[in-house]
Amino acid sequence: DIKSSNKVINAWCMYDWANSVYSLVITTAIFPIYYNAVTTSSTGSYIVSFFGIEIVNSVLYSYSLSFSFLLLTVIQPILSGIADYSGNKKLFLRLFMYLGSASCMSLYFFDGNNVEFGIICSVFASIGFTGSLVFYNAFLPEISSEKDFDKISARGYSFGYVGSVILLIICLIIIQKFDVFGFPDSQSATKFTFLLVGIWWISFSQLTLYYLPQKNKGIKITLDVLTYGTKELIKVWNYIKNFKNLKLYLFSYFFYSMGVQTIMLIASYFGDKELNLDQSKLI
């Protein structure tokens, strides 16, 4: 029985181990600092050109992340409909995983002279990461009983924290001791860590893809399938409208979550521009 199979459950948790390095290394700890450093001119100017538009580097990066989140808000109901209605969850998990990891590795070629390329790669990495999570989470009912959802989800989170911290430590050692590893400067070492993130993500995801079940229902992706997720969201909204406390909780959690994520995403810029912290302290 696939459900409650420890091997399958651990394989599912390994995707958290694989993809959480994106959250920690790319969105939080290293890439924002690198981006800010390479897009700041020698005179200290923060202005960059993005397809001919002059804009402050941190504002551009914030807008790009906002755009990726807005786009994901639109497509997530569609993705969830595909995940619930069809049996192609593994295929879409694989596609979004490769999109995200390849985008992370492509950041190796971003050096500040090709701002458009770096921003586009970071947007695709965000889409790949979040899109893959839709199909990853959709596997949970297939591999576990409902009573074990919380326990297995917690195990996945713990795998993610451990895996991402391990790679972050490796990346920091490479950056701080770049000469020991044969890099000419810390910038080259930092770019190499983006390659490591993509390789880590792809490599450990193979365990997940190998052991997770494939249940192809043979259902074609029609308009009904694409709108299924949106219809379900409307049903849920009509249901929770009758529960005042639940509505208050969800709205409160929304603003709390957005606040925490905003701090995580822009803390490095605040530390650099407002507090003038050294890059090593920012990391």
Predicted feature locations:
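C-terminal membrane-cytosol helix-exit motif in multi-pass small-molecule transporters
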Residues: 167-180, 198-218
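Central cavity-lining transmembrane alpha-helices of secondary-active solute carriers
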Residues: 26, 30, 55-81, 102, ...
